[in-house]
Amino acid sequence: MRTTIFRSSLTAFVCTALFALATPAMAATVNMKADLKATSEVPPTDSKGTGSVTATFDTASKKLSWKGTVSGLSGPATAAHFHAGEAGKNGGVAVPIAGADKGSFEGSATLTDAQAEELMSGKWYVNVHTAANKGGEVRGQVTK
């Protein structure tokens, strides 16, 4: 009788363990943000502008969704982008951001595997450009 109970318990444990190992990793929604400042630009600007971006990243679909605002810029934003690059380094445009010229903006994009890896590794930043600061007026590293 004890042997039967032990075998049944062991079988149940092994089946549960195998099921857990066979189940694919669960997708997660990661909350992210970027605080936009002139001092974060490379090189820094003397702008009084500021801004913020909040974002969510779905690790299964690789969809990045964002909302942001900018204010106090030297003039209207002429462009805004997510760039690939570590803090203190400039990098290429990864995803354009529409609507920053209005002061507030939102959007979404589906990332490639390489882009998703860079984003999750802290190697992306948001940059807002103006006519007076063509290379970028305010910038913020995207963090979790």
Language-model-detected regions and their locations in the chain:
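Metal-centered catalytic cores of metalloenzymes
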Residues: 2-17, 22-80, 84-144
